[in-house]
Structures are given as C-alpha cells and as structure tokens.
Amino acid sequence: KTLFPYTTLFRSKTTVLRLISGLETPKSGEIKNTFRKTGFLFQENRLLENLTAMQNIAIFMDEPNEHEIIALAEKIGLSSGDLNKYPTELSGGMAKRVAFLRLLLCGCDLALLDEPFVGLDRDLRNILATMLVEKIEQQGMACILVTHDRFEAARLSREIMQLSPKGMDVQNVITLPTPLSERNSAFEETIVAREFQGIHYYE
C-alpha cells in the first residue's frame, strides 16, 4: 500500500507509520499489527553511530551473512570499504542506501517506508525500487510506503490511499491489480494521467 499525502507539509504521514509500528500509541481506538516482525525505514535514516555500515545492516538480520550484504551493497554502489565506515563518514546518499539495505535484510514481513528515495538520483532510485519489488513479490513482504511522488506510487503500489490535506482521513483509494514486476514507465504515465489528474498540493 502507498499513503499519498495531498500536501507537501503533511506531518501526519509519519505519525501513521509510527502508530502502525507501535512507536506511538493512539489517543483513542486501537491499531492491531499482527505481523511477526515490522521494519521501519525512517526518512532521516537513523543509523547507529557507534556501528559501522556493515554492522548497522547486520544488526537486525536473523542470520547475518556478510557475503550477502556485500553482494547487495555492490549493486547500489557501496564498496567493502564503504561498509567499514561509520555513519559520520558517509554521505547522505550513502547513509540512505545503508538504511535501505538494513530494512531489506532485516527479515521483516511488514516494511514501513517514509519517503525512501528522496534525494537519490533516478538510476539509483530505479535500482532500489527494483530490489524492493523483488522482495515483495518473491518473499511476500507486505509494504506500506509514504511518498509524494505520483510515479513512484504508481510503480510500487497495489493500493494507493490518498490522504486529506488537513488530517489522516483517506479521501480516495486507487487499486492497481497489475503485478509490480510487469509495470514500466508507460504504465506509470498512464496511471498518473488517469488517477491523479486535477490533484493539487496544499501548502
């Protein structure tokens, strides 16, 4: 699923993910998360500064495998040397990639992603998105993604929930049955033109 806020200043989007993860408690009502393990990719990365990149990725793995980490890291432009660096030695883009790998390899069956590809170039975004799709389709990982990018929502979502500009109400739900692995840029453009026509952001 994808949460698509109508506003670029939508602060409640992160609150939704924090409530689902159990990091915050609702003031009323109840949220039941019945998944075995929930992973959270924060917008600000949240790497542990006293651990190397390699250790940050391995810390939540059920069975840490350095060879697997190195192989996946190389796909997204991280060398073995980069994996031995501490977070303060990494650029913002490198830290985001480390945080992404940590989520991908943590063994969660529910992944919560808050604007995961912001600040990354198009080629890298495509690589990470492909890796995420493979994880979803091959291993059955459930995913809730927050994004303001309409094309990203069209590529990665089976269901898009458009959120109201002044709260957490769902204004519209778009269902996309086409398998994620069969989607391409033409599909994304068609969905954006059809489903997001006339949508304006509120400041």
Sequence positions of predicted segments:
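Hydrophobic anchor residue at the start of the ABC signature
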Residues: 99-100
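Conserved ABC ATPase signature
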Residues: 86-90, 94
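Helical segment within the ABC ATPase nucleotide-binding domain
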Residues: 125-139
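Conserved ABC ATPase "signature" region
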Residues: 66-82
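Helix-to-loop junction immediately C-terminal to a conserved catalytic motif
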Residues: 21
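Conserved beta-strand-loop-alpha-helix hinge in the C-terminal portion
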Residues: 166-195
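Short, small-residue-biased leader/transition segments that mark boundaries at the very start
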Residues: 2-9
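Catalytic Walker B motif of ABC-type/P-loop ATPase nucleotide-binding domains
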Residues: 111-115
